[in-house]
């Protein structure tokens, strides 16, 4: 549910009298590679809404900074500001956008409640949104043996384990430094600790991956129904019908994340769930999807480089001017390039012609 702000925060404008919802600026605080943020940004793109976006870097712990915790006491992205309204949590933001922008020029992603398609879209949206994506993400990093062709580098396992300890210490320190946010920081610390205990449990991970397969079986069956309902000369359908809906937003972003994590080959391809495979290939060609999420092979490099620039900007002493900034950027850029080159090298080796001795 949207809440009102008593004063301007983060540069958010108060609603001006006489202005329509469409005329009031939308401001989104997000992280480009956050799963929840991607769903919201895809909805904004599909609805062709104008929105001012601010990247809140999770690797740099910007979501734990006091200014952001005052926007959202859970310290999680995304957060949407629309005039005096502050809306947190992806599902609530998406519902707010769908219920607020009702003019004829703005595409609707949810059928009318009286429509035969409404319960179908709502069912698959709720089913897909209930998947524990944070557990899949942390789990594949902590236990890469459960994945195949994961695009997350091996060093990340050690890195995330050390970062967990650092984050707990950081939250404790922030709680002491900001008495007004003490409860919020302590609550976040407890949630983090509880989640990561589960996410580091192999038995739990195997259980939720088995449950994921059952969900994807339902999706595969639904996609097959769409194919059977559609005449040969008809338009190719989406998950719940001819239109791209909120159920498709959830499914498209989920499949893209599973591909990045290394769970794609386990769930589709090589004759397994062919409708799901065809659906994902079609989604990749969708203009709005490419604009928001891009190619799966570019996710790692597009996460590293902006973070490198932010680190350089934050740490560079002003007295030394641009020389140090350029140096830091070059160093961090080189680090990102080396990560990219390592993956590219393996691709080149695979394509290199083998000598023929016969």
Swiss-Prot record:
Cross-link position per record: Glycyl lysine isopeptide (Lys-Gly) (interchain with G-Cter in ubiquitin): 50, 172-173, 188, 190, 203, 206-207, 214
InterPro entries on file: Glutathione-S-Trfase_C-like (IPR010987), Glutathione-S-Trfase_C_sf (IPR036282), Glutathione_S-Trfase (IPR040079), Glutathione_S-Trfase_N (IPR004045), GST_C_GDAP1 (IPR034336), Thioredoxin-like_sf (IPR036249)
Biological process (GO), any one: mitochondrial fusion
Coiled coil (residue ranges): none
A GO-annotated cellular component: cytosol
Cystine crosslinks: none
Modifications after synthesis and translation: Ubiquitinated by PRKN during mitophagy, leading to its degradation and enhancement of mitophagy. Deubiquitinated by USP30.
Subcellular location(s) of the protein: Mitochondrion outer membrane; Cytoplasm
Residue ranges constituting the GST C-terminal domain according to the UniProt record: 153-309
Annotated signal peptide: none
Bilayer disposition of the protein: Multi-pass membrane protein
Residues of the GST N-terminal domain: 24-105
Residue segments, region Required for mitochondrial localization: 320-358
Keywords linked to the UniProt accession: Acetylation, Coiled coil, Cytoplasm, Isopeptide bond, Membrane, Mitochondrion, Mitochondrion outer membrane, Transmembrane, Transmembrane helix, Ubl conjugation
N6-acetyllysine: modified positions: 203
TM segment ranges: 292-312, 320-340
UniProt key word Zinc: no
Primary role: Regulates the mitochondrial network by promoting mitochondrial fission.
Family in the record: Belongs to the GST superfamily.
Self-association state and partner proteins as the record states: Homodimer.
Protein name, per record: Ganglioside-induced differentiation-associated protein 1
The organism of origin for this protein: Bos taurus
Lineage: Eukaryota, Metazoa, Chordata, Craniata, Vertebrata
């Amino acid at each position: 549910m949207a809440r009102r702000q008593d004063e301007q925060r983060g540069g958010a404008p108060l609603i001006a009298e006489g202005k329509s919802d469409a005329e009031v600026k939308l401001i989104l605080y997000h992280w480009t590679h956050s799963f929840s943020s991607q769903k919201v940004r895809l909805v904004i793109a599909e609805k062709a809404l104008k929105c001012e976006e601010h990247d809140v870097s999770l690797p740099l712990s910007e979501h734990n900074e006091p200014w952001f915790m005052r926007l959202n006491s859970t310290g999680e992205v995304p957060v949407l500001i629309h005039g005096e309204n502050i809306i947190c949590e992806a599902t609530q933001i998406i519902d707010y956008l769908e219920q607020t922008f009702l003019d004829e020029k703005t595409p609707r992603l949810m059928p009318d409640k009286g429509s035969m398609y409404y319960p179908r879209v709502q069912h698959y949206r709720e089913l897909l949104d209930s998947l524990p994506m944070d557990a899949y993400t942390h789990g594949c990093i902590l236990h890469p043996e459960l994945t195949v062709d994961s695009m997350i580098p091996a060093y990340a396992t050690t890195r995330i384990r050390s970062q967990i300890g650092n984050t707990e210490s950081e939250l404790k320190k922030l709680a002491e430094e900001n008495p007004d946010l003490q409860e919020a920081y302590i609550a976040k610390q407890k949630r983090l600790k509880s989640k990561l205990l589960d996410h580091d449990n192999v038995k739990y991970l195997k259980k939720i991956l088995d449950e994921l397969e059952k969900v994807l079986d339902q999706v595969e069956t639904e996609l097959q129904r769409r194919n059977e309902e559609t005449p040969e000369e008809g338009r190719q359908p989406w998950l719940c019908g001819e239109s791209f809906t909120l159920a498709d937003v959830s499914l498209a972003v989920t499949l893209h994340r599973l591909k990045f994590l290394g769970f794609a080959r386990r769930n589709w391809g090589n004759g397994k769930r062919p409708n799901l495979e065809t659906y994902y290939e079609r989604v990749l060609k969708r203009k709005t999807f490419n604009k928001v999420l891009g190619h799966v092979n570019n996710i790692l490099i597009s996460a590293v480089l902006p973070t490198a620039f932010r680190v350089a900007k934050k740490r560079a002493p002003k007295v030394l001017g641009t020389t140090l900034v350029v140096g830091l950027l070059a160093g961090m850029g080189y680090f990102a390039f080396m990560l990219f080159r390592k993956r590219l090298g393996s691709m080149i080796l695979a394509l290199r012609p083998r000598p023929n001795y016969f």
